[in-house]
Amino acid sequence: MHGQAPRSQASVTDATNLKDSRARMWRYPAHTRGRRHKDPDQEEVFVPIRGTLTVLVEDPPQRIDVEPGDVIVVHQGTPMQARNETDEEIVFFAYGAPPVSGNAEFLDDVEKA
């Protein structure tokens, strides 16, 4: 998003030759966020490895802080946004099935939930 440090990702899908799902490792610098969206086809699982991942789900958004060792599942068609609202970089694993891309509907961003 404009004005924030870039996020980075590594494709686990490519490295492991996944066929029926997609997986990525993400790094979010301090105070960055992904785009708010809903995916009609894909269920997603998020697992923080380092730091607290904030996920806004539903509409109106509900804030869920996910710590390392916790897991959050976002079902198909559910509005969501992944965020790092901390002063430290976070690292998390994201897994989705089926392995579709390009169908997400992007939504207006919200400041706080």
Ranges and model annotations:
Residues 16-18, 29, 40, 59, ...:
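A generic beta-sheet turn/junction motif
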Residues 3-6, 81-113:
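Double-stranded beta-helix
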Residues 25, 38, 49, 57-59, ...:
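Residue-level recognition of conserved beta-strand positions in structured domain cores
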Residues 42-68:
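A short beta-strand-loop-beta hairpin characteristic of the jelly-roll/cupin
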Residues 35-36, 55-56, 64, 74, ...:
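Short beta-strand His + acidic residue motifs that chelate non-heme Fe in jelly-roll/DSBH
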Residues 1-25, 35-36, 104-113:
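A short, N-terminal "cap"/entry segment at the start of jelly-roll beta-barrel domains
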Residues 32, 41-42, 60, 78-79, ...:
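A generic "binding-loop/recognition-motif" signal
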